């Protein structure tokens, strides 16, 4: 089953976006209609307004749905975050840097020799692996979007750009750690000579310009559930690219991917710890938030990926990742099972409302439902031949989905 079947948005429709935003402390909601005005429909594709629209539809979005009393929870957690969350960050002086894995440019002979070694090691690695590695790198390079999105979360966002709130410190320092991932993969891929860097760079620019449809609703419950899921997903993905790099004989690339995976695991632990604390303080609100996010579907952060050519680029990248075993629908179900165990969702008892109990029942049966869907999808896939798609990232060569 393609990861995209579970994690992507429907194709973009040409219509105004509608954003629904409840006023804090009141039940009515505001509906803000946002549209791009064009004077000549025949030139629609050339209008600046549409030129920067995401290639996929960003559905109607709710904003600021968390009530004030829930925001107070995050204020009360600041001492906890200072003591329990920030220690998951590494001091800069103790952290690895991309240059630790790359040829040193100050010595001409050594630099050129090491670049030749990289190109020799990677020349026989198949295109499908590079498609997935590039997709992973592009996802990491869209980091400005992720920091921006975290700073939309009420109660924890960096209000000034330099706030000393532990939540704001975490967001900035987490971003700084993550920044090394895309930087390192980008430089290594450039040195291999195996990918079309201009098309890769275009994809990064398109993706950052498109943003992401997070479905957070400015709600930190939703935001931290999402990041818990995504950090585990990236841990799995980078771990599998490390394993495949070893199989293909590139020990350095395996070490790069493994090092990034270790960072993602540490970040996963931190985010799951936040949600674990929320389940302790507010089990009813937490289980409802988790069920809500799963019903809306946890979409991958790069689901608006586009290279200027392929309108279904993310779906195609996801299909290749599924086929070569880097990230699969089974992983998606496995992550949910892991988080349900980690947060002890099945054993929640006292303190749940009727809606909370219904959310609990839904969540506890969801992994098996996902697995059954995967099995049926896999059975259907076996009956049809797998198509190939041209990827601009590998100079337009066809890669099997």
Curated annotation (Swiss-Prot):
Cofactor requirement: Fe(2+)
Location, primary (coarse class): plastid
Record-marked site positions (Confers substrate specificity): 216
Binding site for Fe cation 2: 178, 231, 264, 267
Keywords: Chloroplast, Fatty acid biosynthesis, Fatty acid metabolism, Iron, Lipid biosynthesis, Lipid metabolism, Metal-binding, Oxidoreductase, Plastid, Transit peptide
Region described as Disordered: 1-31
Listed GO CC annotations: chloroplast
Similarity-based family: Belongs to the fatty acid desaturase type 2 family.
Protein name (database record): Stearoyl-[acyl-carrier-protein] 9-desaturase 3, chloroplastic
